[in-house]
């Protein structure tokens, strides 16, 4: 079912930029289009929204609806708004992504020490498989058609073309409808990829769901490190096998992830009842197809901010290639508030277009 949404650009911003002669605002684009402004100086990802490049870029905003935990109470569905800006250099695309979220969710499936000294992995009691909405992380995702066969249907249906409800999972399964259709997926995972500065570069093809051979249906990762973006920490003799080198509890100044190479043998004596520790070791994606998209993330005043970069042309068959500056490139956006799959989304397609140099 299509959800209602609103696209908007800031009239005040357009007027201001027109006065200073910004090339981008002299170019007319449709209300559903995000105009990438050419810049000779790349934005500093770590500077967030304050980098001067973003003051010259026109925003595009879209309403996101139907996402778990975005409502007034935990678990309730609600809405958010995402605001996007884009810029490009001779060989790179940059995007500023900001959306409202009242909570910064970081407690992704931690182990917690119990009163009797045992360790328990915290999990949503209502989760029947792949649907945790209590102990998870904040995420966002973008989908990009990679070829004309995919774009033709995406133009009509947006992200909904790949969402198939009523197929064993609360939010269905994700796959394209025809052989040859391929969606490039940028999947920013707040605790698994974001801390190392990566967006998980994935894709969606026409693989149907099979509980044994294709539990994720058509959603797959680009070629990357062995084990994927993270490795789970197991319980050994009732205790987590590893802990972070600093031996801090995650809920007392530590983190809910362990960076690869920072794991050490677990020392139970370092923790007291109620302490929580990470259940994941996160792997760097650098130097792999899966690590093509970089990000710098921050959270403040109820707002997530990501500054993203990717080569215009990666050469990967799993990626959208921004090779033709005269084309428009369809995309969709979804935000996840402490939810594994129950995302808030704008189902109608948006389009990235490139301004003149």
Please give the residue ranges for each predicted region:
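Bacterial N-terminal signal peptides that target proteins for export
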Residues: 1-10
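C-terminal motif of bacterial Sec signal peptides marking the signal peptidase cleavage site
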Residues: 18-21
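Acidic/polar low-complexity flexible segments
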Residues: 24-52, 111-271, 314-357
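Short, well-ordered beta-strand segments enriched in hydrophobic/aromatic residues
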Residues: 47, 92-99, 304-310
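Beta-strand-rich interaction surfaces with strong enrichment in secreted/lumenal proteins
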Residues: 72-73, 82-85, 293-299
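N-terminal onset of structured domains
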Residues: 77-93, 98, 104
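Short alpha-helical segments and helix-capping/turn motifs at coil-helix boundaries
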Residues: 78-82, 124-129, 291-293
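Extended, compositionally biased non-globular segments
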Residues: 257-322
């Amino acid at each position: 079912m299509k959800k209602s949404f609103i696209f908007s650009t800031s009239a005040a911003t357009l007027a201001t930029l027109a006065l200073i002669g910004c090339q981008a605002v002299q170019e007319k684009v449709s209300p559903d289009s995000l105009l990438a402004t050419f810049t000779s100086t790349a934005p500093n990802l770590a500077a967030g929204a304050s980098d001067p490049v973003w003051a010259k870029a026109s925003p595009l905003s879209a309403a996101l609806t139907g996402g778990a935990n975005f409502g007034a109470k935990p678990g309730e569905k609600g809405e958010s708004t995402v605001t996007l800006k884009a810029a490009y250099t001779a060989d790179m695309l940059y995007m500023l992504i900001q959306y409202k979220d009242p909570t910064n969710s970081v407690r992704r499936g931690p182990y917690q020490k119990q009163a009797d000294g045992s360790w328990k992995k915290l999990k949503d009691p209502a989760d029947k498989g792949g649907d945790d909405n209590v102990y998870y992380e904040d995420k966002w995702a973008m989908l990009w058609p990679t070829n004309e066969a995919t774009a033709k249907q995406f133009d009509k249906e947006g992200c909904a073309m790949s969402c198939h409800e009523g197929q064993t999972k609360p939010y269905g399964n994700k796959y394209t409808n025809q052989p040859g259709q391929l969606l490039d997926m940028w999947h920013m995972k707040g605790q698994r990829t974001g801390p190392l500065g990566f967006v998980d570069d994935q894709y969606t093809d026409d693989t149907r769901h099979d509980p044994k051979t294709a539990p994720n249906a058509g959603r797959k990762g680009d070629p990357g490190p062995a084990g994927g973006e993270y490795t789970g920490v197991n319980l050994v003799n009732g205790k987590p096998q590893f802990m972070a080198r600093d031996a801090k509890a995650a809920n007392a100044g530590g983190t809910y992830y362990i960076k690869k190479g920072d794991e050490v043998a677990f020392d139970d004596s370092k923790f007291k009842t109620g302490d929580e520790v990470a259940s994941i070791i996160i792997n760097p994606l650098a130097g792999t197809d899966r690590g093509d998209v970089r990000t710098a993330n921050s959270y403040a005043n109820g707002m997530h901010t990501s500054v993203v970069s990717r080569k215009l042309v990666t050469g990967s068959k799993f990626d959208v290639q921004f090779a033709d500056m005269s084309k428009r490139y369809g995309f969709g956006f979804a935000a996840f508030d402490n939810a594994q799959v129950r995302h808030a989304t704008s189902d109608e397609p948006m389009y990235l277009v490139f301004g003149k140099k």
